[in-house]
Amino acid sequence: PGETIEMGFETLRLNKEMKVNYAWIYPLQPYPGTEIYQYAVENGFLNKEFSFDDIDPLGILESPLERKLKDGKKLKVLHRLFYYGIKIPGFVHLLKLLVYLPNNFIFEFLHRFSLLINYAKFHKINLFHVFVVAIRVFLTERRIRISIKADDVREA
């Protein structure tokens, strides 16, 4: 808790300098019962009612802490495009502007695509096959989110 956009860019710079093979970063997940959870509650990043049900089950897409961070929206965009900041020469200059835009479908797609690239490289499998499966999952996930929102509207 307490990460700033400057800290995020410093993490990117360090990863770029180290020439990492797999540029994977994950948002912090403050699991109840841990010291980081207690710190987050005591410092106003989480409320006391926070539970395991509030955590992204994969731990790669969302962090409940992002909402409370001063630079939370910027950090979310940085996290989504982190891979490209490391792997594409000069992209970090564009990224410093992109963090001022709201997160959107394109950033989400690019984030998932970077996860696929890393997954395919790490497991030495065909990227095309991984990509086809990922597109199906992504579209299914969007349909589920739209369905949940529609149900929420009907209940209101």
Q: Predicted segment positions?
A:
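A structural motif corresponding to the C-terminal lobe/cap of the Radical SAM core domain
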Residues: 1-100
